[in-house]
Amino acid sequence: MFMKKLPDRKYIEMLYYVRLGEHCDLNRPETFNEKLNWLKLYDRDPKYTKMADKYEVREYIREKLGEEYLIPLIGVWDSTKEIDPSALPEKFVLKCTHDSASVVICRDRASFDFDEAFRKLDEALSRNYFYPAREWVYKDIRPRIIAEEYMTDESGTELKDYKIFNFGGKPELIQVDFGRFVHHERNLYSTEWKLLPETFEYPRNGSVQIEKPENLEEMLRFAAILSEGIPSVRTDFYSINGRTYFGEITFYQEGGFGHFSSKEYAEKLGELIKLPEKKHE
C-alpha cells in the first residue's frame, strides 16, 4: 500500500535503480529506458489508453488499416462468469484487455481446464496493471476479457509475432521472441532483416534461422501508419500464411526497465526518441 502512494516519478526512480542498478536521469534523459520513463510521466496523450486496450484498439486498427487485418473476435465479457464454455469453438484464445501477458490458449476444448483458466483471468482482472511499473496507459482501461480465433500457420511452426520499434512514425528495429515457454530467447533485426549483435532483456541466438517474412514490407508500412506522430511505440504483427494480422501496441517495452547488452546501444536507441513538450506534470 505504501508503494502505491509514492508519486510516480519517485517510484520510477527507485524501481529503475533496483532493476538496473543505476540512476535514472529524468532531467536529461539519454538512454532508451530513461526516455521511456520520461514519456510515462510527461507524454500522456489520452489516445494512448485506447491504443493499449486490447479491445478498444480494434477500432483504431479498423480506421487506420482495415477490418481484414484484425484477428477475428469471438466475444468480449466483463467477467469469467459471463462466459459460456459450451458456446466457444474447439480452439480459441482468451486474453485480458487491460494488461500484458494474461493470455490463455485453448487447442482442444474437450480437455481444456476452464477452472484454471478462469482463475488466472479472474486474478488478472482484479489487478490494475498501472502500478507495477507506473505505465499510466493501463490505469484507466476497463478490465475485460476477449476471445479471439486461434490462428495457425500452414507450416505448423510456432506462430511468431514481429515486434516493430517505431520512433516518430519511422520503423527502426524488429524484435522476434522464441521459446517463450521453455527457454526464452530474443533476436533483434534491422528493417532490412539483418540479424543484429545486440541483446535486449533476453539472450540472442544467432544459430536460430528465422526467415524474413514475405510480407515484411507491408508490416513496416502498417507500423509507420500506426505510429505516426508518436515519439516511441512498438507495433506487433503476425504473418500467417502470407497474410498480415495486427497483434498489439506497446508503449513501454519491458516497462522501461529492460537490460541491454551495452550502454552504448541503449544510448543509440535513446537518440531515436525525440521527446515532445511535456503534456503532464
Label for each model-derived stretch:
Residues 68, 157, 166-172, 228-232, ...:
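Coil-to-beta-strand transition motifs
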Residues 77, 98, 149-151, 166-168, ...:
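Short, flexible loop/turn elements at secondary-structure junctions
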Residues 88, 113-202:
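Phosphate-binding site of ATP-dependent enzymes
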Residues 28-109, 116, 122-136, 144:
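A conserved helix-loop-beta module that forms one wall/lid of the active-site cleft
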Residues 58, 81-84, 100-105, 113-114, ...:
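Short catalytic/ligand-binding loop motif for oxyanion handling, primarily in non-cytosolic enzymes
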Residues 239-281:
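C-terminal active-site "lid" helix and adjoining low-complexity regulatory extension at the edge
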Residues 1-43:
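Membrane-proximal basic amphipathic "stem/tether" segments
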Residues 140-144, 187-246:
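A long amphipathic alpha-helix within ATP-dependent nucleotide-binding catalytic cores
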